[in-house]
Curated annotation (Swiss-Prot):
Entry-linked InterPro entries: Mn/Fe_SOD (IPR001189), Mn/Fe_SOD_C (IPR019832), Mn/Fe_SOD_N (IPR019831), Mn/Fe_SOD_N_sf (IPR036324), SOD_C_sf (IPR036314)
Gene Ontology MF terms: metal ion binding; superoxide dismutase activity
Annotated cofactor note: Binds 1 Mn(2+) or Fe(3+) ion per subunit.
Name the record gives this protein: Superoxide dismutase [Mn/Fe]
Residue ranges that the Swiss-Prot or TrEMBL entry lists as coiled coil: none
Length: 145
């Protein structure tokens, strides 16, 4: 459970700043478009003068946007399909929770723990520093903390 102060800080300050800074960077190169997922999936395609700004701020926006999308005021159940995929990848839901918690608590400093779908279609737990996104590694994030 999260407290209101933490959520307000992350939504109204951090996320809003990432959006503003990503937009400011994109304005310098309108020719590259505005699809952050496509751009961050191929960071070398981003002009050098705005690359790090988009990695940091575009990643921050995408990471937070997924996080907000996943939040719910009520408890939700894992679908049978997802539960089966988790059991196959990690052995059990309890093992998944342990590994995911370890990824989250093992990150020194700021960053994210992720459940991702790899290019091969399997589930994987990973962690990224700061506002780096697994999209840049060719992975599709489906759970973020």
């Amino acid at each position: 459970q999260f407290d209101q102060e933490t959520m307000t800080l992350h939504h109204d300050k951090h996320h809003a700043t990432y959006v503003a800074n990503a937009n400011a960077a994109l304005e310098k190169h309108p020719e590259i478009g505005e699809n952050l997922e496509e751009l961050l999936a191929n960071v070398e395609s981003i002009p050098a003068d705005i690359r790090q700004a988009l990695i940091n701020n575009g990643g921050g926006h995408l990471n937070h946007a997924l996080f907000w999308e996943l939040l719910s005021p009520e408890k939700t159940e894992v679908t049978k399909e997802v539960a089966s995929a988790i059991d196959q990848a990690f052995g059990s839901f309890d093992a998944f929770k342990e590994q995911f918690a370890a990824a989250a608590t093992g990150r020194f400093g700021s960053g994210w723990a992720w459940l991702v779908v790899t290019k091969e279609g399997s589930l994987e737990i990973t962690s990224t520093a700061n506002q780096d996104t697994p999209i840049s590694e060719g992975k599709k994030p489906i759970l973020a903390l």
